[in-house]
């Protein structure tokens, strides 16, 4: 089957924003204008197409990033049809993992900001993730019809808070109730959308007289920004020559693709204004799969040889599984992005990460949670496969004759855990199954059994994250669970270096004995300097310990890292240097060296100034001015460090760093302090030494 849309006319984009910036409404309008949806879904009445899980419709927030395919030929039908694959991403900080996953497989992004609230803390988190994956992006300032809407203020915040270089592509005509349309700064015309047909048609008009001067000023800003794309254009511009519309667009596109500028558009999705022109900007300025660098990977040849795959149907098939979802009708759905080649339903592919073959039973293109079955997918496509057995988020699927492992995704460690138990014994097995399936869908969620208490523990990125997991168990798997008190994920570390720590395991009792003897140095690593949080250096000279026992020493120490000597929490940021020891020809064994290593580790850890680390959260509170003192006082009582505050239209924004252990139940307390008028966001920032009284209490509670 031949390709229907050339790959240069593909746009794989994410729509990303802070909660309540109106992102889901914006996506709904895109689906409406691209002709996919005939009735516009409103978030207010729980009918939005992209928010397809029941909880999302109830809570009005987007949890799972659904992938949807749409076609766009331009506001004035000026293009050949372009295929736009949209990945909707959640805006709540507990679901940052979903954003991270979608950023990994996108080519470009639209950042949606609220014209009143501007750049919010979650916007900054998403921005950092987009920077990490070098995703070219444009901005859409939404809600121009709301009280307090100010387009140019938000443009200023994109510069000051995100450190970006925003270039307005439009200006808003009026604001709040008086918002009527936008000025197109490339064409220097006003765009007026027809309210009678929900903005499907529009007219170009003259720029209002009272805006002429402002429009001219920002038009010059736009031209200057375009001219900076090349010396040739700059000379033309400085020589007083007019740049053509085509030259301007081409130059701006070049600068967006190299992440030098962020083009800013505006509108009101709710009032059907602006989304159409923003879609045109997606086509004009965001990359197709062939505009972004080839994806890197390593060959599965035992030597980890670097390799790459280009966005072409002629290269061997390679794809990345970026999301696993459970569908009530068909079971497991594996969402994947094809980077190169072609695959047909029925084909067998290789999961190169697990060295296992998988068969593509059926391939479906998703429109929110509606499915359309298709026979094949090609480079640049985003689709879902039904029937893959053992694929995890981040796995590579590829041609068995040309194996490659594409760059993996990195997932954050959970910071909060709770014990769960089924309300009835009969549900025990069902709960295990449900949690296993949910953990497969969401790599930032973990589940395990505590060996001492035999309880099932679940861990995640925040209270809301775990609430939703428990809620989904009930809804999707009919398992009611009792939930324990949240527990903090503490860590253990050392603060000084110790040398020549000896560990000896020797047993002589008739027959073959056991003998292992090691001497190690132990030292702290700079936090974050080693992704594993652990390094092992083998400095054995002259074979005093035979090479075959070295891995056993490493393993013995790694087993100790899982539950540290202080309070049984994982040990991080520690280095071990093995430099001496001895062995016995007959009595030495791997087990003996493992035990010797664990003895040395425990001994050394006690002497190396051990500390308990606690997770510190970055907390931002928005509160009415009159409650500022109470909110700050309460944060201080929670051992919070104030990092600054600023005045907003709606009150005061307070920045603080607070230990997670002090933040349980904060939502309720904040509500009562401010009569429900304040809101807050919280995200993991770093691990820091817990004060000695806190550490002592934690250690005693763990019975150490």
UniProtKB/Swiss-Prot annotation:
Give any GO molecular function from the UniProt entry. GTPase activity
List, alphabetically, the Gene3D superfamilies matched: 3.30.230.10, 3.30.70.240, Elongation Factor G (Translational Gtpase), domain 3, P-loop containing nucleotide triphosphate hydrolases, Translation factors
Residues where GTP binds: 17-24, 88-92, 142-145
Q: State the compartments where it is located.
A: Cytoplasm
Question: Highest taxon of the source?
Answer: Bacteria
Q: What is its main location?
A: cytoplasm
Q: Which Gene Ontology terms describe the biological processes this protein takes part in?
A: ribosome disassembly
Q: Which InterPro entries does the UniProt entry name for this protein?
A: EFG_II, EFG_III, EFG_III/V, EFG_IV, EFG_V, EFG_V-like, EFTu-like_2, G_TR_CS
Q: Where is the tr-type G domain?
A: 8-290
Any one Gene Ontology cellular component term annotated for this protein: cytoplasm
Record SMART domains: EFG_C, EFG_IV
Sorted alphabetically, the keyword list is: Cytoplasm, Elongation factor, GTP-binding, Nucleotide-binding, Protein biosynthesis
Give a short account of what the protein does.
Catalyzes the GTP-dependent ribosomal translocation step during translation elongation. During this step, the ribosome changes from the pre-translocational (PRE) to the post-translocational (POST) state as the newly formed A-site-bound peptidyl-tRNA and P-site-bound deacylated tRNA move to the P and E sites, respectively. Catalyzes the coordinated movement of the two tRNA molecules, the mRNA and conformational changes in the ribosome.
Q: Family membership, please give it.
A: Belongs to the TRAFAC class translation factor GTPase superfamily. Classic translation factor GTPase family. EF-G/EF-2 subfamily.
Name-wise, this protein is Elongation factor G
- UniProt source species: Citrobacter koseri (strain ATCC BAA-895 / CDC 4225-83 / SGSC4696)
């Amino acid at each position: 089957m031949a390709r229907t849309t050339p790959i240069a006319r593909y746009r794989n984009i994410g729509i990303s924003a802070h909660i309540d910036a109106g992102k889901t409404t914006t996506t709904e309008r895109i689906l409406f204008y691209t002709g996919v949806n005939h009735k516009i879904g409103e978030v207010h009445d729980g009918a939005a197409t992209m928010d397809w899980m029941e909880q999302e419709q109830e809570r009005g927030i987007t949890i799972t990033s659904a992938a949807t395919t749409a076609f766009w030929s331009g506001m004035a039908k000026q293009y050949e049809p372009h295929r736009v694959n949209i990945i909707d991403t959640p805006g709540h900080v507990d679901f940052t993992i979903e954003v991270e996953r979608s950023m990994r497989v996108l080519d470009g992004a639209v950042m949606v900001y609220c014209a009143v609230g501007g750049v919010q803390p979650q916007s900054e988190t998403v921005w950092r993730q987009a920077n990490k994956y070098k995703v070219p992006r444009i901005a859409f300032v939404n809600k121009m019809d709301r009280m307090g809407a100010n387009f140019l203020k938000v443009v200023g915040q994109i510069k000051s808070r995100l450190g970006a270089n925003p270039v307005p592509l439009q200006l808003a005509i009026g604001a709040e109730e008086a918002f009527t349309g936008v000025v197109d700064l490339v064409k220097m015309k006003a765009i007026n959308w027809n309210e009678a047909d929900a903005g499907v048609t529009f007219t170009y008009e003259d720029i209002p007289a009272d805006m002429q001067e402002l429009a001219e000023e920002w038009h010059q800003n736009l031209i200057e920004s375009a001219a900076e794309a090349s010396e040739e254009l700059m000379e033309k511009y400085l020589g007083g020559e007019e740049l053509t519309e085509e030259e301007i667009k081409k130059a701006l596109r070049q600068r967006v693709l190299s992440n030098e500028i962020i083009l800013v558009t505006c509108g009101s999705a709710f009032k059907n204004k602006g989304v159409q022109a923003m879609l045109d900007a997606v086509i004009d300025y965001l990359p197709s799969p062939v505009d972004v660098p080839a994806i890197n990977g390593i060959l599965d040849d035992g030597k980890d040889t670097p390799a790459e795959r280009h966005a072409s149907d002629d290269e061997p098939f390679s794809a990345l599984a970026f999301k696993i979802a459970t569908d009530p009708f068909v079971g497991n759905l594996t969402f994947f992005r094809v980077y190169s080649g072609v695959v047909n339903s029925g084909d067998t592919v290789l999961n190169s990460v697990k060295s296992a073959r998988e068969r593509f039973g059926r391939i479906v293109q998703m429109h929110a949670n509606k499915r359309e079955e298709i026979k094949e997918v090609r480079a640049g496509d985003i689709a879902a496969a039904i029937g893959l057995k053992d694929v995890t988020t981040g796995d590579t699927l590829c041609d068995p004759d040309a194996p490659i492992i594409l760059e993996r995704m990195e997932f954050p460690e959970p910071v909060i855990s709770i014990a769960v138990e089924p309300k009835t014994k009969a549900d025990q097995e069902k709960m295990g199954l449900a949690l296993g399936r949910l953990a497969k869908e969401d790599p930032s969620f973990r589940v395990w059994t505590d060996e001492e208490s035999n309880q099932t523990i679940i861990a995640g990125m925040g209270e809301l994250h775990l609430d939703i997991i428990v809620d989904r168990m009930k809804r999707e798997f009919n398992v009611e669970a009792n939930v324990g008190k949240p527990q903090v994920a503490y860590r253990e570390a050392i603060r000084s270096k110790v040398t020549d720590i000896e560990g000896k395991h020797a047993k002589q009792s008739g027959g073959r004995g056991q003998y292992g003897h090691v001497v190690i140095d132990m030292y702290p690593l700079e936090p974050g300097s080693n992704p594993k949080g652990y390094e092992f250096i083998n400095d054995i000279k002259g074979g005093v310990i035979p090479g075959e026992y070295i891995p056993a020493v490493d393993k013995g120490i790694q087993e100790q890292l899982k539950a540290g000597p202080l309070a049984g929490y994982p040990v991080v940021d520690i280095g071990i240097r093995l430099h001496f020891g001895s062995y016995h020809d007959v009595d030495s064994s791997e087990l003996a060296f493992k035990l010797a290593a664990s003895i040395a580790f425990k001994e050394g850890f006690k002497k190396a100034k051990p500390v308990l680390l606690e997770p510190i959260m970055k907390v931002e509170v928005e509160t009415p001015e009159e409650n500022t003192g109470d909110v700050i006082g309460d944060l201080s009582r929670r051992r919070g460090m104030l990092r600054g505050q600023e005045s907003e239209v709606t009150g005061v924004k307070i920045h603080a760093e607070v230990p997670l252990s002090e933040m349980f139940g904060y939502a309720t307390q904040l509500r009562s302090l401010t009569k429900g008028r304040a809101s807050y966001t919280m995200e993991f920032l770093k691990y820091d030494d817990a004060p000695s009284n806190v550490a002592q209490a934690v250690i005693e509670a763990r019975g150490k």
